[in-house]
């Protein structure tokens, strides 16, 4: 469950380390984002010579949350932290070329098949 001002880790090699959610996209008064939702973020911490720099405002897709996601069989998949993958503002394709850590099957839509194929593990 991600809302405005939530700090997230970055699960790709775009050069960002920590980001902050500044808006949950998809509705005028939408409060929370879960796994697979697109959010607007600003970069708070980045490595030198990365593809992005501190202060950049981008879109990102949430790939892991502490709250987790409930499956139709009743099971819940939870993670130790909140993480996202940075997206290009126009094409909504991932900026990085590698994904770190597991992602969930809930991302398996037409828009995020690239993230699924790059991920080392799909839960």
Swiss-Prot record:
| One of the GO BP terms on file | translation
Q: Which organism is it from?
A: Edwardsiella ictaluri (strain 93-146)
Q: Which GO terms describe its cellular component?
A: cytosolic large ribosomal subunit
Presence of the UniProt keyword Signal in the record: no
InterPro entries xref list? Ribosomal_uL14, Ribosomal_uL14_bac-type, Ribosomal_uL14_CS, Ribosomal_uL14_sf
What's the protein name?
Answer: Large ribosomal subunit protein uL14
Pfam families hit by this protein: Ribosomal_L14 (PF00238)
Q: Which domain of life is it from?
A: Bacteria
């Amino acid at each position: 469950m991600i809302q405005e001002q939530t700090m997230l880790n970055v699960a790709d090699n775009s050069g960002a380390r920590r980001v902050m959610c500044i808006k949950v996209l998809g509705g005028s008064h939408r409060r929370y984002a879960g796994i697979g939702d697109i959010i607007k973020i600003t970069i708070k911490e980045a490595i030198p010579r990365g593809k992005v720099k501190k202060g950049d405002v981008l879109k990102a897709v949430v790939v892991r949350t502490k709250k987790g996601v409930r499956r139709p069989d009743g099971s819940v998949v939870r993670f130790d932290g909140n993480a996202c993958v940075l997206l290009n503002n126009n094409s909504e394709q991932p900026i990085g070329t590698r994904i770190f850590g597991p992602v969930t099957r809930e991302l398996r839509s037409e828009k995020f098949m690239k993230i699924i194929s790059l991920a080392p593990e799909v839960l």
